[in-house]
């Protein structure tokens, strides 16, 4: 179970403004899950750039959990979102980033993401001393596990092809995290309260991807191996 820790009262935090545009909302005007995923990775990138740390490392996301905050709802088209992000935990070669999403001072969504630094060849590397110089105070010594449970596709799950597009690829040649969330958007119907997406392996150009789904879950498979899994609760979260 994902823990959504409260904002740190000390150390670094970073905020950015992100309006919900046409390309972020569904036909009812509610922000899509992949739109939220883009906002999360954009504010994370902006925060990292703002630190002034000069490094050739790239951060890739391993797990992302998004939930409707108590009393919150899903944002709508043209609303201006304030994303406030901070580092909430760490391990040997990963860090947890918490992000709150608000509109007009009201907290709507909470997110917790596990990020892994990789070198130019895509191999994970240990957190550098510079990381702790910038984020160590807000982390406050909180350690988080980096392992994720082995995925199992349930018996009877429906299956269909999930064609890849060149527009889905990111700078390291993998299908971008936000593009993966489009698969979740395709499967989820109605309001959801919480979604957790886990990346178990890369999905790359040229892969033949199968989308398997069952109530409350989906999997992206390459050669029968699960590369991405997701679990969600659909209980009619508020959208207005």
Residue ranges and their predicted role:
Residues 195-202:
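C-terminal accessory segment of soluble enzyme catalytic cores
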Residues 2-65, 117-193, 240:
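Hot-dog-fold acyl-thioester-processing enzymes
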Residues 11, 65-154, 202-208, 214-240:
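HotDog/MaoC-like acyl-thioester-processing domains
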